[in-house]
């Protein structure tokens, strides 16, 4: 799990280097944490830009976790599912922390909220993060088998660049000028 996507990119590069040395692939799951209700990472990336920034590594899954309970994470998983060509993983929290730093969401409440992800076909791999207990995971496991994994979309074969927002370069765009007039000394 990463809070800053640049950390994920550095880790993915290190894993890639290790795989080259070992002569074999290692399955990698990348999970990001959103900083607040804006749905952005701590560095300001949208969910879509976060996916674009790690997709080149072809991870086993890309996901979101922590920071939110299962109910609050739902709209961001929908956005991730709309762009992800990989498996999607998520271990949400057992709700949001209470004033004492504990988590009040019961195992049954947690499982019911997570069932919505599976019912909508948004995730392939699911678990629990902050505040979850073996009982939370037990309740989740009891219902997970009732749902099919998410259907992977057909590859789109388009270039997607990531900054704070994704930039999709599609044939209909004709010409895309990137970085023009970013020179602070001026540009003719």
Predicted regions and their residues:
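Domain-level signal for soluble alpha/beta catalytic cores
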Residues: 1-188
């Amino acid at each position: 799990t990463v809070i800053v996507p640049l950390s994920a990119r550095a880790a993915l590069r290190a894993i890639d280097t290790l795989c080259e040395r070992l002569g074999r692939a290692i399955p990698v799951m990348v999970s990001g944490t959103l900083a607040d209700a804006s749905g952005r990472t701590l560095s300001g990336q949208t969910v879509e830009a976060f996916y674009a920034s790690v997709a080149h590594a072809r991870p086993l899954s890309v996901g979101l976790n922590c920071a939110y309970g299962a109910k609050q994470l739902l709209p961001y998983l929908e956005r991730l599912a709309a762009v992800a060509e990989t498996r999607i993983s998520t271990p949400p929290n057992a709700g949001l922390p209470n004033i004492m730093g504990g988590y009040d969401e019961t195992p049954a409440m947690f499982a019911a909220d997570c069932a919505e992800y599976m019912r909508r076909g948004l995730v392939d791999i699911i678990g629990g993060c902050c505040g979850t207990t073996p009982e939370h995971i037990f309740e989740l496991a009891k219902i997970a088998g009732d749902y099919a994994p998410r259907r992977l979309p057909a590859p789109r074969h388009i270039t997607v660049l990531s900054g704070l927002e994704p930039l999709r370069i599609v044939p209909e765009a004709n010409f895309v000028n990137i970085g023009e007039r970013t020179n602070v000394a001026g540009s003719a």
